[in-house]
A protein has these predicted regions:
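Residue-identity detector for glycine
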Residues: 7, 17, 21-23, 31
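Residue-level detector of intrinsically disordered terminal segments
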Residues: 14-21, 36-38
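Extreme N-terminal basic, low-complexity initiation segments
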Residues: 1-16
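HhH-family (HhH-GPD) DNA N-glycosylase catalytic core used in base-excision repair
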Residues: 2-3, 24-346
Length: 346
């Protein structure tokens, strides 16, 4: 494996959950060598280029970061760049990722957390993942894997950042969760550092989430059960962050010590924070039926899905993502949609 020398980059261009856990959306556009990161004042971008012997499909890999088209923390610009604002342990960061070529990604970062983010970038993009034990036998899964060799899991290592939107997405329509996320981040988040696209925000820190008044959650259409779960998680955020260094089983146990975080929510968090390729969103409103229709031609329930996907362990979530990216995932529509509930009017 090789790495490009770092340097100054050009200026940036001006029910459990409903659908988010499945990864059905279609996105189109081995380890990485430890490349030194350039250091510079906060106002100047720090840069890094990472490469891998295997392809890297940047768009597909980072797509789980985005919580809807209007996500205040994420932006995709016409030049193909992916902008995101996060809160690293060392401080806020704005980063811009761009597909360099089939096996390379360019990164720019601004803010106090820049150096830490760039140091962790290969880890985030799972450039160290080993797929030697992933040999799917089902022809659709095998074909989906062949078509999408660049899909990586996502491993941000930022647990609380994944907790809040996952809790907001519990047992509601996706549009309801995304609207609540936008309202709360716009109100309590902070401006992203550096030359970020207009409106890019850093999500509030745990202490801020902990002290958001209940009536504000209510006006954002978040009922007491979900808001209480967020507050409880915020109180032990440092302990939750430690889960990133635990085994998948122990990490799930740590997450589920929070009342209101169950198997579905823990999986949604693991898919983004831990890069867990086996984090199946059991309990998702659509997932089991979609897996059944896609692979068996008939609907199945959660228990049958778990049994059927067992041979794919520890890559069950990877298989689900691949089916979505390849356009194979489908489920016939029967009957009316689940009714929309506006809790803010109750």
């Amino acid at each position: 494996m090789t790495a490009l020398p770092p340097g100054q980059a050009p200026p940036a261009a001006p029910m459990a959950g409903v659908t988010t856990g499945m990864g059905w959306r279609r996105h189109r556009r081995a380890g990485a060598q430890n490349v030194p990161v350039t250091t510079a004042p906060i106002a100047t971008a720090q840069t890094r280029t990472v490469r891998s012997e295997r392809p890297i499909d940047l768009a597909a890999t980072v797509s789980p970061l985005r919580r809807g088209l209007g996500d205040p923390c994420h932006r995709e610009t016409p030049d193909g760049a992916h902008w995101h604002a996060s809160r690293m342990p060392t401080g806020p960061v704005t980063y811009r990722l761009r597909q360099l070529d089939r096996c390379g990604v360019d990164a720019q970062a601004w803010g106090p957390g820049s150096a830490e983010f760039l140091e962790r970038l290969p880890h985030m993009l799972c450039l160290d993942e080993d797929l030697t034990d992933f040999s799917p036998e089902h022809p659709k899964v095998a074909e989906a894997h062949r078509r999408n060799p660049g899909l990586r899991m996502l491993r941000t290592g930022l647990v609380f950042e994944a907790v809040v939107p996952a809790v907001l997405e519990q047992k509601v329509h996706t549009r309801t969760a995304h609207a609540a996320w936008r309202k709360l981040v716009w109100r309590y988040g902070t401006a992203a550092p550096g030359p970020a696209p207009d409106g890019l925000r850093v999500m509030p820190d745990a202490e801020t989430w902990r002290h958001i008044p209940s009536w504000v959650y209510h006006r954002a259409n978040v009922e007491p059960q979900r808001s209480k779960t967020i507050v409880l998680a915020a109180r032990i955020a440092p302990k939750l962050e430690e889960a990133a260094a635990l085994s998948p089983a122990d990490a799930e146990k740590r997450l589920r010590t929070v009342p209101g975080i169950g198997v579905w929510t823990a999986a949604e968090i693991a898919q983004r924070a831990f890069g867990d390729p086996d984090a199946l969103s059991v309990g998702d409103f659509h997932l089991a039926a979609t897996v059944g229709w896609t692979l068996l031609g008939r609907p199945i329930d959660d228990d049958a899905m778990i049994e059927y996907l067992e041979p794919l362990r520890p890559h069950r979530y990877r298989a689900v993502r691949l089916l979505g990216l390849a356009g194979f995932a489908h489920k016939p529509k029967f009957g009316p949609r689940t009714p929309y509930t506006d809790h803010s009017r109750i």
